[in-house]
Amino acid sequence: MENLTLVAHIPRQLLALIQSSAAYEKSSGLRVADGVREFLVAASPDFLSALQEATAPDPWRFGFAIVHRIDNVVIGLCGFTGPPDSDGLVEIAYCISPDYQGRGFATEVARALVDFASSSGRVRTVCAYTLPEMNASTRVLEKCGFRKTGEIFDSENHLVWRWEKTPPRSTSNK
């Protein structure tokens, strides 16, 4: 990655971020850009419950902090909605602080997540979901080689577009 570093989340640091950006900074030594904490606070109750029970980093479950190399600040969060399923399907998700949007960072992150999934040797398909309209998120996925495969209703009964990419196969095991 050219501009960013992905740092696997340590559960206690994510719990600190839920508490406050200052608590996260004290726990991790990294500042947090405006807007990042709000993405985590809005996470599902299941994710928050799993986080409270966890003791070790798990990129498939808890993802990564997106650290801007020059500014040395967490500009977003990214990861997967869980480990690959029995069909080798994994879903990616990412968010970037409004102060850092529009600079290509989401594209850099999406590519890194696809590379991570591919290098696991366990993933056949990477998917993502967007609002059902052309926007910055759809352009990110198109740049990364995803193709729109359909429309579905999400768990909150909102129409979304489903995007998929078949990453190159790898023989390593993450």
Regions found by a protein language model. Give the residues of each.
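Glycine-centered recognition micro-motifs in short, flexible terminal segments and loops
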Residues: 98-108
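Conserved active-site alpha-helix within GNAT-family acetyltransferase domains
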Residues: 107, 133-150
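GNAT-family acyltransferases
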Residues: 1-91, 96-99, 112-116, 120, ...
